[in-house]
Amino acid sequence: ALPISPFLVTSADTYLDFDLGRLPKKLPSGMLGLLVMTNNPPHHPDGDYSPDENSILRLDGDKLTYTGTGMLHPDLVRDVPDSVFMLRKVFDEAVNAGKFLAIEHDGVWCDVGTESRLSQLRKMLDQSA
């Protein structure tokens, strides 16, 4: 069952030092999501979405990378007929409709989806300890 209010999502294969307190208590009226975006890493140089001057995400322009963390309104997925689906497709539709906002993160972020990137993150964290 879906919650009645926006909820936090975060990918299990990412690491970031983002302060979740920066997220709003609720989404602005009509918005279906807010994604935490960061500079593009070497393995994803083209990014995902481009924030405009009002932080509304667009499919064109200078793109940033989605960190895997954000807030989603349950209406975003409420009517998706499939029990298993790609969030990217749902995100693209909402972005195309101007219903997603961005908040930029310039701190540490790492996609640890490969052994190599996980190893690099572990080395970085060990050095900073």
Describe the role of every protein-language-model region:
Residues 7-8, 15, 20-28, 40-43, ...:
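Catalytic-core segments of class I nucleotidyltransferases/pyrophosphorylases
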Residues 50-55:
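Short acidic-glycine loop/turn motifs at beta-strand connectors
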Residues 9-11, 35:
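Short catalytic-loop micro-motif centered on adjacent basic/acidic residues
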Residues 33-34, 100:
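Hydrophobic/aromatic residues located in beta-strands of well-ordered beta-sheets
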Residues 6, 32-33:
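Short, Asp-centered acidic motifs that coordinate Mg2+ and/or phosphate
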Residues 34-48:
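Short beta-strand-to-loop element that shapes/binds the nucleotide-sugar donor at the catalytic cleft/hinge
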